A protein has these predicted regions:
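Mg2+-dependent endonuclease catalytic cores in nucleic-acid-processing enzymes, primarily RNase H-like
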Residues: 116, 123-239, 258-285
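Short, conserved catalytic or adaptor-binding loops enriched in Gly and charged residues
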Residues: 27-33, 86, 92-94, 175-180, ...
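Stable alpha-helical structural segments in soluble proteins, enriched in small hydrophobic residues
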Residues: 243-255
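ASCE P-loop NTPase helicase motor core
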Residues: 1-60
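Short acidic/glycine-rich loop or secondary-structure boundary segments that cap or lie
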Residues: 49, 77-78, 90-93, 111-115, ...
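Generic detector of well-ordered alpha-helical packing
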Residues: 102, 107, 162, 243-244
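ATPase catalytic-site recognition across NTP-hydrolyzing enzymes
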Residues: 45-107
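Short beta-strand scaffold segments in enzyme catalytic cores
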Residues: 113-119, 249
């Protein structure tokens, strides 16, 4: 506790040993206008050389290493995806036109509406997450505009709650997005084997990550923020701060709907009646 009579700055440092407590969650997801959060890692401790870091890390239990070295909270009964996030990261690159693309969306209001865009390298069966979007307390009109900006032609897969009727218009939520020009799939998401349970998709994503067939552009900070908080408690996935993860699951489990279709480029029209042959007739005689 501190009283800032002089209007100064208070620094608070801590290691999140108790996991995602209310205080940690508040700083990681709901910062006030006068607050800021900086993840200080061992890389900021210039007095620690690489040999010392390796020695300390080796002495720590595996589940504490990310928490001690990177300030990432120990979460519940464990991370849903217990991997080094650096193994998922790739430098952004121009996506080949022959890779199909797809978007997954998770609807929200008090919690964010989230969308994730993926590209599929069919030669190696590798999924690449190349963009994401997350926003709370906005209308479908706002979300639709953000989705269209990233390619109106990209198909969008959506969960079963998109069939529910919007309280304002009385229309199904998915239909509202469709009317706004979003290329919504014709029906709600289902796993490739049927049903809408979470675990089959989670296991497939984990296997892809473990075998190097799931990659994420390294600048997608919001996506990695959720990855670090996506955890289980008593064996069950905690349904909080999981919007981008859900959208990713919908997309990665719907590769059969990924599309190559793009707007065809129209031939450019002549901008004048100037006839090159007529004015250079002598050159062709």
């Amino acid at each position: 506790r501190a009283a800032l009579k002089s209007g100064g700055i208070v620094y608070m440092t801590f290691t999140p040993e108790s996991g995602m407590t209310e205080v940690v969650t508040q700083f990681m997801t709901k910062l006030g206008q006068s607050q800021a959060l900086y993840h200080a890692t061992w890389d900021d401790a210039i007095h620690l050389d690489e040999d010392v870091k390796a020695e300390i890390l080796a002495a720590l239990p595996p589940h504490e290493r990310a928490m001690r070295s990177k300030g990432i909270p120990v979460l519940g009964s464990g991370l849903v995806f217990p991997l080094d996030e650096n193994d998922l990261k790739v430098e952004p690159f121009a996506i080949p036109e022959y890779w199909p693309r797809l978007c997954g969306i998770d609807f929200g209001w008090d919690h964010p509406t989230a969308a994730v865009w993926i590209a599929w390298d069919r030669d190696t069966d590798t999924v690449y997450v190349y963009d994401c979007y997350r926003k709370s307390a906005e209308t479908p009109v706002v979300h639709s505009a953000a989705i269209r900006e990233r390619g109106e032609w990209v198909p969008v897969v959506w969960p079963h709650d998109g069939s529910q009727h919007d309280k304002g218009s009385g229309k199904p939520l998915a239909e509202i997005y469709r009317k706004q020009g979003v290329n919504m799939a014709h029906k709600h998401f289902e796993n490739p084997t049927g049903g809408i349970s979470i675990e089959p998709g989670i296991m497939d994503m984990l296997q892809r990550m473990q075998t190097g067939r799931f990659k994420v552009f390294n600048y997608l900070g919001l996506w990695f923020e959720e990855l670090r908080m996506y955890h289980r408690k008593d064996g069950k996935i905690v349904k909080a701060h999981d919007d981008l993860m859900s959208a990713t699951r919908y997309a990665s489990q719907s590769l059969q709907f990924a599309s190559l279709d793009r707007p065809k480029k129209r031939p450019r029209k002549a901008i004048s009646d100037y006839n090159h042959y007529e004015h250079h007739e002598g050159a062709y005689a």
